[in-house]
Amino acid sequence: MARASCAWHSLWLLQWTPLFLGPSAVPPVWALNLDSEKFSVYAGPNGSHFGFSVDFHKDKHGSVSIVVGAPRALNASQEETGAVFLCPWKANGGKCNPLLFDLRDETRNLGFQIFQTFKTGQGLGASVVSWNDVIVACAPWQHWNVLEKRDEAEKTPVGGCFLAQLQSGGRAEYSPCRANTMSSVYAESFRGDKRYCEAGFSLAVTQAGELVLGAPGGYFFLGLLARVPIENIISSYRPGTLLWHVSNQRFTYDNSNPVFFDGYRGYSVAVGEFDGDPSTTEYVSGAPTWSWTLGAVEILDSYYQPLHRLHGEQMASYFGHSVAVTDVNGDGRHDLLVGAPLYMESRADRKLAEVGRVYLFLQPKGPQALSTPTLLLTGTQLYGRFGSAIAPLGDLNRDGYNDIAVAAPYGGPSGQGQVLIFLGQSEGLSPRPSQVLDSPFPTGSGFGFSLRGAVDIDDNGYPDLIVGAYGASKVAVYRAQPVVMATVQLMVQDSLNPTLKNCVLDQTKTPVSCFNIQMCVGATGHNIPQKLHLKAELQLDLQKPRQGRRVLLLASQQASLTLSLDLGGRDKPICHTTGAFLRDEADFRDKLSPIVLSLNVSLPPEETGGAPAVVLHGETHVQEQTRIILDCGEDDLCVPQLRLTATAGDSPLLIGADNVLELKIEAANDGEGAYEAELAVHLPPGAHYMRALSNIEGFERLVCTQKKENESRVALCELGNPMKKDTRIGITMLVSVENLEEAGESVSFQLQVRSKNSQNPNSKVVMLPVAIQAEATVELRGNSFPASLVVAAEEGDREQEDLDRWVSRLEHTYELHNIGPGTVNGLRLLIHIPGQSQPSDLLYILDVQPQGGLLCSTQPSPKVDWKLSTPSPSSIRPVHHQRERRQAFLQGPKPGQQDPVLVSCDGSASCTVVECELREMVRGQRAMVTVQVMLGLSSLRQRPQEQFVLQSHAWFNVSSLPYSVPVVSLPSGQARVQTQLLRALEERAIPVWWVLVGVLGGLLLLTLLVLAMWKAGFFKRNRPPLEEDEEEE
């Protein structure tokens, strides 16, 4: 029993469990003639799974209704028994009425046995089918049990079907798997066990009225088919009896072959003609778990002998979940379609994606077996369950080939579901959908879980489609619109002669080369309106941008024309002629490519603003082309002979520098005209085009652009349109090149002269290598602060206040500057300072202060704790620290005096060596070392009359440059810094007579100035007149 329970639950889950999925991609498609805007919607009770199964029903008066199954609907006692609804068709939907059946559990006694039926949870409406006046609705999970004393058959889902005769109101039931065999009979063997049939899980009916039921749980889940004429079911039915005999019912046989175990034969069923005998019917059965879940589809004859057995290609893909039979290629033979909604394909990331697949098997001529699928339709949406349902549609667009609908009930932009329409054709089916219907219901509706087509519900001559969405408990009816088959012709002359100016523009009176364009449009179709309004749009030189069109209409000087055409469905085509002209050759570049003219025909929207009532199909778009006649000889074919030479000079490119490279190029054409000729210079990484000049008068500055081609930059310069025969152009192109650190020892420029000619369009490619080198210039400068120092000997006794009062400090500074362009590694700087900080030395090293990353060491190290002796009253002190009165100092040696003494390390004097290192110095970087020294008092006292020049000396070198290219030279250099030590003269008293002469001279000058002013009347003053004086006057 555990095995039976597990298998039964797997059947239930695959049919009923919805998946909630994320967005998925749908390939772009064009719409055909199912009206996706004006569809009818029928709704059932919430949660009833209304739409789980659907079918059309046409009564004897020709009225069409829709039969809808709702397997989870509640009965009047609020028990979940399921229900079947009949919905009269209306354009705007309408109310659905339930068909009444006896849905009560029943118990009957027959001798020592008690028969029981259990209809709660039976799933009435899981499958429905209509034939003539009869509607068959099945409940595959209806349970049955037989009790006999202490034994029982066990309560199991045998399944059952209900039949409703609409005209007479009669009812009948059919449950082919009911039996009164006790479970003890099956204790040793399950052979022949029909207790788990789930009869009616799938359902089909032949044109003759033979009912075919699939029972995937029959024979202990091998599955079986049961078929019987509907008339026999009705005639054999005995109300009030739970177990009765139905004549002429036939079952498939049990099988002990392990490949059939748990195969679920009868999971899907269909009928068709596959043996070449139209008088017989063959039965198609899907077994999706046959041969350990590989799946199979069988085509059985009337004796249930297998004619064909088709195997799945992938384990657990559920090959055979759905089957459909129709003639898609118009050869008069039925073809087979099989769905495998769990098929997984391997994607680019090597992961498996569950997308679903549909297999098309075209029936060959003669007795050949169906084996290899003719076409594979694979879903594109992850977990969309493409192929869950397949429905023949009939000839949807009236082109002579039957079409099909394939459902992906959990596909679509948000997992709401989709139905894809595939058109039949002579080769089978179109590989891409002609129309995609997106679910109008919320996510999880299962839109497309059930499909039914091939019936004209609105009597317009085109078959319509029912789509069930059980998750939303709704059904949508899509009606097919009439299809207008268009025929379009466009005629234009083969070539245009630009030199033949046979027309004049009205506005500018400019002569132009003109030509005529003729357009013809026709339309035919089944049941189309007598008067048809079409819109025709003509586009000139469509492949060019709107502002670059080479031909325009004469009347409007525009590149497009829209016409309104009125024609009947059976009238002859309507033709219209218009004039156009070729623009002047100076207004465009392209003279070689064809001029493409396009004519597109479409249906304008209705005056109410809605979609048209018909659909336009067929030849709605046509293109023709013409060309411009060229001056290229009798064959009108120009064959250029393009040449190119180039040089780049001898100077290499330097890493780190702002290089400007001058390319000398000569382009020549020794053949016929080269149209749209251009110089193409492929620039290496780091190179940028600046400008290009030519040696042609009036053509000095070339028109060039920089573009990207194949991830590299290329400079394109126009050379003429056309570049005529025997043309020679000298070109100088300037290119900036930088960022060469990773370029290697050279960069290459690829040059070529190209044209748009069809024959021999380009010159040979010239590769121009340019060497790369590394170079750096490092500058060393020195400075002394102060540049000179004046000292003088003082008379009298002074007490020493501090070291700075009596001792002068000096600084020798050396600065390194990398001017570039490259970076240097391993820079080493040596500085020699005279003296080793001994008491007898003239200079005493105080400190070494490096900056800019330098690391320095001193040998010997400065003795910062060395004690100086106290200077005597006759010692000297720097005059720049304190000055009481003006002093004279010695600028240089006077006659009889000695030259200044040079104190440096060039001789045998003892010196201090400062050694500094810098690992890396980039372009523009600076580094500095400051050496602080002070003068030694004892040395100056010993040599009071001497002047000195204090000199330090520095050298530097570089070990390498961090590049794998040749180095021009390694930087090195030296510098010296000098400080002059000057002696001041002794102070002298000013003579008294100098003072007396100065005072007397000043008094004399003042007296003379006063006398001159008196003579000039400066001291005479006049009083201003009073008012009385003015009155007297």
UniProtKB/Swiss-Prot annotation:
FG-GAP repeats: 35-96, 109-173, 184-237, 252-304, 305-370, 372-431, 434-495
GO molecular function per UniProt: extracellular matrix binding; fibrinogen binding; identical protein binding; metal ion binding
Paired cysteines (S-S): 87-96, 138-161, 177-197, 503-514, 520-575, 632-638, 704-717, 856-916, 905-911
Binding-site positions, Ca(2+) 2: 327, 329, 331, 333, 335
InterPro entries assigned: FG-GAP, Int_alpha_beta-p, Integrin_alpha, Integrin_alpha_C_CS, Integrin_alpha_Ig-like_1, Integrin_alpha_Ig-like_2, Integrin_alpha_Ig-like_3, Integrin_alpha_N
Binding site for Ca(2+) 3: 395, 399, 401, 403
Keywords, alphabetical: Calcium, Cell adhesion, Disulfide bond, Glycoprotein, Integrin, Membrane, Metal-binding, Receptor, Repeat, Signal, Transmembrane, Transmembrane helix
Signal peptide: 1-31
Subcellular location: Membrane
Record: glycosylation sites: 46, 75, 600, 710, 957
SMART domains: Int_alpha
SUPFAM superfamilies: Integrin alpha N-terminal domain, Integrin domains
Keyword Cell membrane among UniProt keywords: no
One Pfam entry name: Integrin_A_Ig_3
Extracellular face of the membrane: 32-988
Transmembrane regions: 989-1014
Top-rank lineage group of the source organism: Eukaryota
Chain sites annotated for binding Ca(2+) 4: 456, 458, 460, 462, 464
Described function: Integrin alpha-IIb/beta-3 is a receptor for fibronectin, fibrinogen, plasminogen, prothrombin, thrombospondin and vitronectin. It recognizes the sequence R-G-D in a wide array of ligands. It recognizes the sequence H-H-L-G-G-G-A-K-Q-A-G-D-V in fibrinogen gamma chain. Following activation integrin alpha-IIb/beta-3 brings about platelet/platelet interaction through binding of soluble fibrinogen. This step leads to rapid platelet aggregation which physically plugs ruptured endothelial cell surface.
Family to which this protein belongs: Belongs to the integrin alpha chain family.
Protein name listed in UniProt: Integrin alpha-IIb
Lineage, top ranks: Eukaryota, Metazoa, Chordata, Craniata, Vertebrata
